[in-house]
Amino acid sequence: MIIKVFLRLLLLCAHIVCIDGKLEIRPVVSGVRIESDVDASGFLGYGDAGELLVEANTEVDLVIFGHGLENVEMVTFTDSVCVTSEFNVSESTFYIHKDMKIVFKYAFVAWPQPWRICLKSECHGLIQIDDDRTWIQAVQSTHETFMPVWAQCAILCLLFSISALCSGLTLGLMALTPQELSILMKSGSQREKKHAAAIYPIRCHGNRLLCTVIIMNVIVNTGITLLFDDLAEGLIAFVASTVGIVVFGEILPQSICVKYGLAVGANTIFITKFFMFLLFPITWPLGKILDKYAGVDIDVVNRSRMVEMLKMNMENDACDIDLSTLKIAIGAMELTKKSVRDVMTDIDDVFMLSEDQVLNAETMTKISDSGYTRIPVFEGNNRNKVKNLLYVSDLALIGKDNNITVKAVARFNKRRLRIVDESMPLTALMDEFKLGDYHLAMVAKATEVKKHHHGKFADGTVDSFILKSMKLVEATMMPQVENPEDHPVTLVGLITLEDITEELLQAEITDETDCYVTDDAQKKRRTNTSKKSAAELFCSEKKSERLSLHMLEMTEKWLLEKTPLFGNMNPKAFENLIQRNIREVLIVPPKNSTSPGTLNLFEAGVMSKRFLLILEGKATIRFNEKDLIFECGPWTCFGEAILEKMEMCISDRKEPSTGFFFLPDYNLTVSGPCRFLQISTSSLLHSLRITQFVKEIRTPKISITSDDDFGSPTRKASILDSSPNSRKRSSTSVMNSLALPTARLAAKIASVEELKPLME
């Protein structure tokens, strides 16, 4: 026992060295450890021999335990002996330096051999710690994954595909309602019908399908995140998984499926069915719960949405539907929302007649200028007391000189008068008009019609007017009474079947009789400029009476002096040519009219085929280019170019044509009574051919009448002498060389008497 104590004292004395009279204890290391958690970065664990395993090039907190450590000036690391130390850690880097503990930070370099600790003090120099439990092995960290990297990459590609499919189906399939699929199955192309038929059965289970694709999408995205976390750590795994899911799992598939969702959904329908089968225990109860509380997926397209869809198609250039067809469809859809008030013509714009007016030329002119065929008739001067209707057809047998009043004609025909409420729907009124009894109705204020018709129009909704057509007519018909004061109403407008048709077609209808059109859509009044004015209505050109003998003789003399074309014309044909082509212009100006009516005989730039000779009255010549106006009186002719062309053609022994014309550079108008001779190219050519034929049959001719008994023909000469009353013509007349074809005349005519019908 005494020996053991002595040996320990010797050992202790061996560790105590005196330097300059100072005792120093030799540093002793009892252990080394990493002062951080086991899972901390850099510490990997312990080796088979008990050495510390740290990650190479990773800074760790190294703790050295023992006693006598306060005199340590430096800590070095070596792989063999202290003389060949590779790294040194000075005392200045110790952030804990005590007698029993030294702590500092250090990053070890990867090395095949473990690093050994060497301590250096002032008295003892380098002291190597050979305990293998104090060794530190720096190794390169190797991350172990769940499975090989190539397998994880393949699984990631598969998961990204499934994620993209689920995201696309969520938008593509759920955007197509069962109603839209049903429409495609009936009216789509062959490919659309096939795809819609494949999707329709599972799309009917909308909530269950929605739960399936959403749950699968969440599961797959979670798997993608886990695999990325296994392949990489920290920020890299987060960024990679986020970018991959957003770009490849959401944006790209949804941008494709929003346009081709039908085709994608149909071609991947077997995958969708597999997912629905796989998740059936989860999605079936969820779908039932959603069906009960969220409702079944039923899309009902109301009228307003359908109208807006049609309007959007009108603005789309790729729409293959005709624009007019879309307008009609929109008009039909919006017709039920409109009432009579929205379509009617305002009462101030309605053309009416007083029953006291006389049907003279002035009134007839107003009626014709209006362009209307049904005209309301009011009592006295009160336009609010409309008592009857006047149809233009009622005036067919009434002359403008009979001075019959409007009241007499209206009461005789007793046309049906209809007064409707301004809030009456157009559909109800159109049902009445379709009966055919009337196509025009007066519109009264709503409160007054309701008052007299027992509240049949209590509200303006369509439902209140869904009645039988005849019942509706009886409920709203204004009774024909002698005293209309018993049912006073305030008229606000007029409506016709044409107004309703225009709303249906979404276009204004203008026929050939429209002069003033009230455009209800644009609220403008348009004027039909192609219609004649009232002053021109009774300006007419017609055939006149025959000329007197004196006037006829003067006309013949003037024509014979004007051109030799008439010189050798048959007298009877010449006389008929004149008498049968006398025309006159009659002008009946409206009463109180400041501008007289005019009639154009020639228009500048418009070809004409007639020759005119004014016999009575005056005409006005206007040269538009030079802005010159002249008045001409009797014995002024126009269209001489036609006679000159005819004369030149005959003198050249050519067959004249009825196609001769001349192009005036002036306007010839008549503003008062005028009588003139009109010779057209056809009538002139006819008279010349008659004259030629008469001349031919009056020349001696030999004709074979019969054979005698000896077989030789008997010749008979017949000479037609000229009439003693025939006029002597100039021998220089062009008719001496007249050679007109007479093929159109009857071949059997042999005498002048038989020519009388043609000459007439």
From Swiss-Prot:
Pfam families: CNNM (PF01595). One of its GO terms (molecular function) is transmembrane transporter activity. Disruption phenotype: No visible phenotype. Double knockout with cnnm-3 results in 22% sterility. Quintuple knockout with cnnm-1, cnnm-3, cnnm-4 and cnnm-5 results in a reduced lifespan and 100% sterility. Residues 175-208, 252-261 are cytoplasmic. Its main location: membrane. It is found in: Cell membrane. Keywords: Cell membrane, Glycoprotein, Ion transport, Membrane, Signal, Transmembrane, Transmembrane helix, Transport. The chain crosses the membrane at residues 154-174, 209-229, 231-251, 262-282. Probable metal transporter. Probably acts redundantly with the other metal transport proteins cnnm-1, cnnm-3, cnnm-4 and cnnm-5 to regulate Mg(2+) homeostasis. Belongs to the ACDP family. This is Metal transporter cnnm-2. It comes from Caenorhabditis elegans. The gene is cnnm-2.
